[in-house]
Amino acid sequence: MMNLAAGFLLMLLEVLLLPGTPLSAEESPASTPGSPLSSTEYERFFALLTPTWKAETTCRLRATHGCRNPTLVQLDQYENHGLVPDGAVCSDLPYASWFESFCQFAQYRCSNHVYYAKRVRCSQPVSILSPNTLKEVESSAEVPPTSMTTPIVSHATATEHQAFQPWPERLNNNVEELLQSSLSLGGKDQQSSRRPGQEQRKQEQIQEHKLEEAQEQEEQEEEEEEEEAKQEEGQGTEAGLESVSRLQSDSEPKFQSQSLSSNPSFFTPRVREVESAPLMMKNIQELIRSAQEMDEMNELYDDSWRSQSTGSLQQLPHMETLMVLCYSIMENTCTMTPTAKAWSYMEEEILGFGDSVCDNLGRRHTAACPLCAFCSLKLEQCHSEASVLRQKCDASHKIPFISPLLSAQSISTGNQARIPDKGRFAGLEMYGGLSSEFWCNRLAMKGCEDDRVSNWLKAEFLSFQEGDFPTKICDTNYIQYPNYCSFKSQQCLLRNQNRKMSRMRCMLNERYNVLSLAKSEEVILRWSQEFSTLAIGQFG
C-alpha cells in the first residue's frame, strides 16, 4: 500500500513540476520563493489532488514519514514556489488562521480533513509579535493608529517570512476567561500604568503641533471618556479580585506577594498583542505553583495523601483551572496549542521533570513530535479514571507508550485509535505506523513473547484503564481473560470472522465468565491455527 502511495506521489510531482503557463503580471509578484500560491495556482494544485482519496494518500504518507520525507518536501516546495518557509504561515481557515510552520499547517489539513485549505499571505506584521521587539511595540502602541498604519503595512512584506509569536490572542478562550476571572486583572493598575503614557502623549502633541485651545479641549474630553471606560473595565474585574482574595485570605503575605495577582498586566485583554511566550508560560507556571504553595500553607491535605499524589493533577485546588486546561488540549489538537507549550515548559524547566515523559504505570511516552510525549501524558491524566502521575524517567520505565487519545487527534505519531466510547475500547487501529491487521498476523506467527508483539499488547492494555477494576480484562461478551494476549487473540479471531468484540470496563455489579489459564492458551492456539490455515489456503 505504501509503495502504491509513494508511486502516486511521484506521478503527482511529475505533473506538478512540468513547465506551467506563464503568470500574468498581477500574479508574478506572488512567485517569490517561499511565498504562497495564487488562487489560480492553487486551483491547478488541488485539481491534481482531486478526488479526496488522492489527498488522503498524501496525508497517509505524511503521517507515516513526516514532513522531511524527500518526496513530501518536493510537494511542499511546489506549494511555496520552490522554498518551504522556515517561520510561521497563515491560512484561509477562519478558525485556524496561522501556524508556527508550514509542516504544522500541512499536518493540520490532514488531521482535520480540510485537504483543500490554502496558505495565504499574512495580513499582520510579524515583527509586532516577536519577543525581540516587544519593547518597541509597547512604545509604538502609544502612537495614534493613523501614524502607525503606513509603516506597519510596508514592514509586513519585509518580515512575513519570520516566525509569528504564537502566543498572543491565540490561547484557548476558556483558559483566558478562567485566568481573568480567577486571577487579578488589576484594573486600577492598568489605569495607573496607562495614564502617564496618555499625559505624555498629550504634552507631546501640544508641543509638536501647537494645537488651538478648542482642539485641546476636544482631546481632553476624549481622554476623559477613555478614563471612564477604563474605570468601568476595572470595576468589571473586581469580582475576579474578590474571588481570589477569598482563596488567599488564610495565606501569609509572602505568598500573596508571589501570587499572580501581583502581576495584573499579564492578563489584560487590551495588551494581548504584545505578550510574549515567556510571559504566557510564566502565567500558567505561577498559577499552578501558587496553588501548590497554598495547599502547603493551609494544610488542605494531610502529608500522607500529598506524598501519594505528587505530580497528580488532582493535587491542585484550582480544579476549575485544570478543567479548562484539560478542555483546551482535549478539544483542540493538543500538540498545536499554546496551552500545551506553556504547561510543558513549566513542568520541564520549573518543576524539573526534564524532557523525557514517564508515568507511575511504568510507561515512557513516545516523543514522536515535539509535544507528543507531553500531550500523551496530559491527555491520559485528564481523561483516565485511574490515577496517572508523572514521574522522572529511570530504568523502571520500560514500556514505550503513546495515548490513543492523542492518536485520535490524528497527529502523525504512527499510532491511531478510537477514543473509548461508553466504557468500550476497540483497540489501536495503528501501532508504530502498522495496522491492527498486521499485528494480529504477527501475533499468530510469532506468539505473545515476541518483543514487538509484546510492546503492542502492553500499549493497548495501558490505553484503556477504566471501570471498578482497571487492570482486569473484560470483553463485550462478558468474558474475563487472565491475560491480554488471550483477549487479543480472541478479538483477532472474531474479527477475521467479521464479528465485532471490544474490551469494556470490568464492573462490580456485573457477572463475567472467567477464563482459566488453560482455556486462554486454547484461545491463543486457535487463532494461530486459523491464521496458518488461511495462509496455506492463500499461498500454498
UniProtKB/Swiss-Prot annotation:
Ribosomal protein listed as a keyword: no
Biased composition (Basic and acidic residues): 196-213
Effect of deleting the gene: Deficient male and female are normal in behavior, body size, and health condition. Females exhibit normal fertility. However, males exhibit a severely reduced fertility. The acrosomal structure of spermatids is severely deformed at the later steps of spermiogenesis.
Entry protein name: Acrosin-binding protein
Keyword Transit peptide belongs to the record: no
Described purpose of this protein according to its UniProt entry: Acrosomal protein that maintains proacrosin (pro-ACR) as an enzymatically inactive zymogen in the acrosome. Involved also in the acrosome formation.
PTM description: The N-terminus is blocked.
Feature: compositional bias, Polar residues: 245-266
One Gene Ontology molecular-function label: peptidase activator activity
Signal peptide: 1-25
Comp. bias (Acidic residues): 214-230
Segments of this protein annotated with the region Pro-ACR binding: 26-105, 316-424
Residues of the propeptide: 26-272
Superkingdom in the source lineage: Eukaryota
Lineage, top ranks: Eukaryota, Metazoa, Chordata, Craniata, Vertebrata
